[in-house]
Amino acid sequence: MATSRLQLEGDDSVHLHITHANLKSFSADARFSPQMSVEAVKEKLWKKCGTSVNSMALELYDDSGSKVAVLSDDSRPLGFFSPFDGFRLHIIDLDPSSVTTGGWLEDTSLVEKYNISEEDYAKRTDSFRKFKEKRVSQNPVAAEAKTKENYMEDLCANIKVGDRCQVEPGEKRGMVKYVGRAESLGPGYWVGIQYDEPLGKHDGMVKGTRFFECPRLQGGMVRPDKVKVGDYPERDPFEEDEI
């Protein structure tokens, strides 16, 4: 066990798993400098989960699931609490009126929904259904063929495998690993991305088809209009706007 906790030579950062008491589906992995104050850690986490710094409590758990510390002093450096690679940093939102309370950000059944009867919707002239019916009636065959064959093909002209890129939303950075069609995902063109961090959904295989190779949870398939290629180097984990 002690061997797994050793840091890389010349690298004093620590790799922690992040969870949130109110957001059961929230999960992230990030590196922190032990020199960061607890307050600075909270500021980085606030940008990711929405819990304000003043309402955030942090608990540290070891890799066996045992609580080893409560980070109660915002002025102390993270290293004071002796975190090791693989430990878990657990966020607790102390604000009872927070948007994270009660699962509001995850449970869509809690949101009051707008309902309209089928009869009333059919009478509307400004609905998406009417717009789609009009487009199809004008040239149904050509419209369908264009969608299947050429959707966003023009946006792929300057996107090449190996390009560094930034993907929206979230300004996620990575490398282009695939450019082309992906019938299992939908008509038109897609871009396969290997993200620098585990922000993806797969390892390059989607619905039984392998489009490229990459580490688990670092792969993504997105539309070309979400991709900007250029000088987007891998971010320093200790940049101001990053965890």
UniProtKB/Swiss-Prot annotation:
Pfam families: CAP_GLY (PF01302), Ubiquitin_2 (PF14560). It is found in: Cytoplasm. One of its GO terms (molecular function) is alpha-tubulin binding. The keyword Cytoplasm applies. InterPro entries: CAP-Gly_dom_sf (IPR036859), CAP-Gly_domain (IPR000938), TBCB_Ubl (IPR045172), Ubiquitin-like_dom (IPR000626), Ubiquitin-like_domsf (IPR029071). Keywords: Chaperone, Cytoplasm. SUPFAM superfamilies: Cap-Gly domain (SSF74924), Ubiquitin-like (SSF54236). GO terms for biological process: cell division; embryo development ending in seed dormancy; post-chaperonin tubulin folding pathway; tubulin complex assembly. Expressed in roots, stems, leaves, flowers and siliques. Disulfide bonds: none annotated. Supercomplex made of cofactors A to E. Cofactors A and D function by capturing and stabilizing tubulin in a quasi-native conformation. Cofactor E binds to the cofactor D-tubulin complex; interaction with cofactor C then causes the release of tubulin polypeptides that are committed to the native state. Interacts with TUBA6. Involved in control of cell division. Regulates probably the availability of alpha-tubulin for dimerization of alpha-/beta-tubulin, which is required for proper microtubule biogenesis. Decreased expression of TFCB results in enlarged mesophyll cells and leaf epidermal cells with bulged nuclei, increased ploidy and increased numbers of spindles and phragmoplasts. This is Tubulin-folding cofactor B. The gene is TFCB.
